[in-house]
């Protein structure tokens, strides 16, 4: 009884590596977006809203 040759392992490894890479990249990008980026945008928008309100108060006075 002969042992069957191992075929397709390189292709399977490449597909697995690419899939894991995309999954990890997507997870890290999503984490960055919601943990780091969104709070910075909220803080910046609040600052500019406050600045605009101050300028409007000075212009109307």
Swiss-Prot record:
Keywords: Membrane, Mitochondrion, Mitochondrion inner membrane, Oxidoreductase, Transmembrane, Transmembrane helix. The chain crosses the membrane at residues 14-36. Pathway: Energy metabolism; oxidative phosphorylation. Component of the cytochrome c oxidase, the last enzyme in the mitochondrial electron transport chain which drives oxidative phosphorylation. The respiratory chain contains 3 multisubunit complexes succinate dehydrogenase (complex II, CII), ubiquinol-cytochrome c oxidoreductase (cytochrome b-c1 complex, complex III, CIII) and cytochrome c oxidase (complex IV, CIV), that cooperate to transfer electrons derived from NADH and succinate to molecular oxygen, creating an electrochemical gradient over the inner membrane that drives transmembrane transport and the ATP synthase. One of its GO terms (cellular component) is mitochondrial inner membrane. Residues 37-56 are mitochondrial intermembrane. Component of the cytochrome c oxidase (complex IV, CIV), a multisubunit enzyme composed of a catalytic core of 3 subunits and several supernumerary subunits. The complex exists as a monomer or a dimer and forms supercomplexes (SCs) in the inner mitochondrial membrane with ubiquinol-cytochrome c oxidoreductase (cytochrome b-c1 complex, complex III, CIII). It is a single-pass membrane protein. It is found in: Mitochondrion inner membrane. This is Cytochrome c oxidase subunit 9, mitochondrial. GO terms for molecular function: cytochrome-c oxidase activity. One of its GO terms (biological process) is mitochondrial electron transport, cytochrome c to oxygen. Residues 1-13 are mitochondrial matrix. Residues 57-61 form a propeptide. The gene is COX9. Its main location: mitochondrion. Belongs to the fungal cytochrome c oxidase subunit 7a family.
